Amino acid sequence: MRAFVLFAVVAMAATMAVAEQCGSQAGGATCPNCLCCSRFGWCGSTPYCGDGCQSQCSGCGGGSTPVTPTPSGGGGVSSIVSRALFDRMLLHRNDGACQAKGFYTYDAFVAAASAFRGFGTTGGTDTRKREVAAFLAQTSHETTGGWATAPDGAFAWGYCFKQERGATSNYCTPSAQWPCAPGKSYYGRGPIQLSHNYNYGPAGRAIGVDLLRNPDLVATDPTVSFKTAMWFWMTAQAPKPSSHAVITGQWSPSGTDRAAGRVPGFGVITNIVNGGIECGHGQDSRVADRIGFYKRYCDILGVGYGNNLDCYSQRPFA
C-alpha cells in the first residue's frame, strides 16, 4: 500500500535519518523548537530528556527535565478519547476484511501515549482533541482500507492494515550506525508505516526495543506499533518540526517556511509526513483523503478544524 511512501523523501536525502541531529554527534548543534537533545544525538521530548540528555533538557532554559510544556489538567489521553469514541472513530478496523483485525486496541493506544509526555495532554481541551484527531487522521490514511462507496464512508476504515502489502524490497540501506540484521526486512509496518532500517533503528532506540533485529514487533506487538508512530509524531527531523509542535501551536514558521507557504495547520503536518510526494503541486487526492479523516475525527470529538488544512501550495521541506 502506501507503506514505503512515508519515508521515500528520506531515502532520496539520506542525511535525514542517517546522521544524528544534535549534540556532540552533530558538532554541538541544538534542536529546533526547544526540544531535548538525547545522549545519542537525536531531537525529541521524553524519553529524549532523560539520562544523558545533552542540551535543552528542560526547554531552552537548561536543566534535566522534559522540554514538553506541562500538560493541562484533566488526565491522560483517555480523558479525551474514551474506549467508545476510539471504537467509533476507527469504526471498521476490526472488520473481517481488514488485515489488522483485532490488532490496534484502545489499551495499546493509551499505553503508548502514556510513554510520550505531552501527547494528547498539551494545552487546552480543544488543542488536545485536535492533536488526537490529527494523529489518528494521518495514520488512518497510511493504513486505510476504505474506498469511495465503502459502508459508513471511506473515512470509517482507518487502521485496516498493519503492514505493507506486496513489499518488493527489504528496505535495507547500508549504514554503519543502523546496520540491517541478517534476513530482516524493514518494509512499512504499524500506524505510520515505519520503513527502512535508518528509521527502525532510531525509533527502536527511543522506545527501548531493538527493532533492527526484531522489526516484526511493529506488526505483532500493538503497543510497540503505536509507540513507533508516536515517536515519529513527537520527533523533529530538521528542518522539519515535529507534528506535535505544529498541532499544539509550539512551532513558529521561519521566514523561509512562510516564503514556501508552510504555515501552522494540519496541512504542514502532511508536508512533514509525505510532502515530497504529495505537496506543492496543486490538488492531490491523497492530501484530500488525509483531510477527510481529520474532519471526521474532529467532528466526532466536537472540535474545530483550524486553518490551513491542505499543502497544495506548500513547497516540501528541503
UniProtKB/Swiss-Prot annotation:
Catalytic activity annotation: Random endo-hydrolysis of N-acetyl-beta-D-glucosaminide (1->4)-beta-linkages in chitin and chitodextrins
PROSITE patterns for the chain: CHIT_BIND_I_1 (PS00026), CHIT_BIND_I_2 (PS50941), CHITINASE_19_1 (PS00773), CHITINASE_19_2 (PS00774)
Q: Which SUPFAM superfamilies match?
A: Lysozyme-like, Plant lectins/antimicrobial peptides
Listed GO biological process terms: cell wall macromolecule catabolic process; chitin catabolic process; defense response to fungus; polysaccharide catabolic process
> What keywords were assigned to this record?
Carbohydrate metabolism, Chitin degradation, Chitin-binding, Disulfide bond, Glycosidase, Hydrolase, Plant defense, Polysaccharide degradation, Signal
What Enzyme Commission number(s) appear in the record? 3.2.1.14
Cite the Chitin-binding type-1 domain residue spans from the record.
Answer: 20-59
GO MF annotation list = chitin binding; endochitinase activity
Cysteine pairs bridged by disulfides in the record: C22-C37, C31-C43, C36-C49, C53-C57, C98-C160, C172-C180, C279-C311
Secretion signal: which residues? 1-19
Q: Per its UniProt record, what InterPro entries does this chain match?
A: Chitin-bd_1 (IPR001002), Chitin-binding_1_CS (IPR018371), Endochitinase-like_sf (IPR036861), Glyco_hydro_19 (IPR016283), Glyco_hydro_19_cat (IPR000726), Lysozyme-like_dom_sf (IPR023346)
The stated induction of this gene product is: By ethylene.
User: Which residues does the Swiss-Prot or TrEMBL record annotate as the active site?
Assistant: E142 (proton donor)
One Pfam family recorded for the sequence: Glyco_hydro_19
Family note: Belongs to the glycosyl hydrolase 19 family. Chitinase class I subfamily.
Please give the function described in this protein's UniProt entry.
Defense against chitin-containing fungal pathogens.
Q: What is this protein called?
A: 26 kDa endochitinase 1
- Biological source species: Hordeum vulgare (Barley)
Lineage, highest ranks first: Eukaryota, Viridiplantae, Streptophyta, Embryophyta, Tracheophyta
